[in-house]
Amino acid sequence: MQKYFVEARQLLALAIPVILAQVAQTAMGFVDTVMAGGYSATDMAAVAIGTSIWLPAILFGHGLLLALTPVVAQLNGSGRRERIAPQVRQGFWLAGFVSVLIMVVLWNAGYIISSMHNIDPLLAEKAVGYLRALLWGAPGYLFFQVARNQCEGLAKTKPGMVMGFIGLLVNIPVNYIFIYGHFGMPELGGVGCGVATASVYWVMFASMLWWVRRARTMRDIRCAERFSGPDFAVLLRLVQLGLPIALALFFEVTLFAVVALLVSPLGIIDVAGHQIALNFSSLMFVLPLSLAAAVTIRVGFRLGQGSTIDAQVSARTGVGVGVCLAVFTAIFTVLMRKQIALLYNDNPEVVTLASHLMLLAAIYQISDSIQVIGSGILRGYKDTRSIFFITFTAYWVLGLPSGYLLALTDMIVPRMGPAGFWCGFIIGLTSAAIMMMLRMRFLQRQPSSIILQRAAR
């Protein structure tokens, strides 16, 4: 039992900085929304529209690069640190290629916004301007993620946290300068948020690069000392590992976007209540998501050491800690749901609906924690294809259709409105949790030689 407590302490030591880094990232989005809203409601709406298109695209690239963390962790655990720098260099090449693709897609997404039915021309113009300013930050963001994944693969999660808060501190004054046009800069309104955020991503990358080059613990890993061109064999392997993660993230983000679109015709009260419950649930999700990143590092490191038993201890401890956290957040949600809803809105109907939906959110928090930590475990085992198939099946084959039937039709029960979609979330996330755990057990029951062979690829 002692080994599980020791492992839990190590997991939390890795996870807490990741949690704080996620808080900083979320706060940056909050600052953009508030400061754009302070300029005008149209500019705030433009930032919201642009962000809704930016997030799926950039998270696709983010997911692709997550393959680097278990690769670095496994090489570190096996003592083959001399092979880390070449892998990271190829990570930068991959980030560069993906950045170009994302920038092209986002530039052309502007035409989609302009052609939206009944959209205000000024709103469309500002949203397109915001997106086309922000897209220049895509390379900086993805290069930062490569450096961050290198650090996290080496069990150094604090640098990502520090750079996240540096980005937040830089974002506020730079937003102010470009939104309102100070120090000789043009007054850009909401578009200035895009300029500021793009600039901040490059600052975060430069800061992280400076830290990596000066860190004593990484003096033997010098990615910038010699140039190497693209190694397509390594790039292909990273894509094979990362693409299922990227697609899983993309499908998860688009699922919630589709549900938001399906809820929107139900009326202002339903939309507001749904959005409040979803926003709070997203904040709670940061805890298991950060723990999942820590579990990936620990499982990858243990497999690199050649110990499948210790990898199992890391995996089981991660699930146990995740369930404990989820029980705590679920109880907190149930007890404080009305007070939480009042922080967002004081309309009695909105508060009542949001409080009701938060009860459903509390139910799925345990399943959500298990499935996201299960995903982190499978990443550590480099079994990423199953993550995609499980996520797609749970969300799009089970969760969304069942939510649609419950929310908008009378086929099963009288139409439930937004609560039906939340029941669909429960079905989808619970299915994902069960399938993740079954897959984990299947992997762990394989002979050690097969597990270690897969991890060493």
Swiss-Prot record:
Any Pfam family matching the protein: MatE
Membrane topology designation: Multi-pass membrane protein
InterPro entries: MATE_fam, MATE_MdtK, MdtK-like, Multidrug-R_MdtK
Broad class of where this protein is predominantly found: membrane
Zinc-finger among keywords: no
Record-level Gene Ontology MF annotations: antiporter activity; xenobiotic transmembrane transporter activity
Keyword Transmembrane helix on entry: yes
UniProt-annotated location(s): Cell inner membrane
UniProt GO BP: sodium ion transport; xenobiotic transmembrane transport
Domain of life per record: Bacteria
This protein's GO CC annotations: plasma membrane
Role, per record: Multidrug efflux pump that functions probably as a Na(+)/drug antiporter.
Homology family: Belongs to the multi antimicrobial extrusion (MATE) (TC 2.A.66.1) family. MdtK subfamily.
Protein name stated in the entry: Multidrug resistance protein MdtK
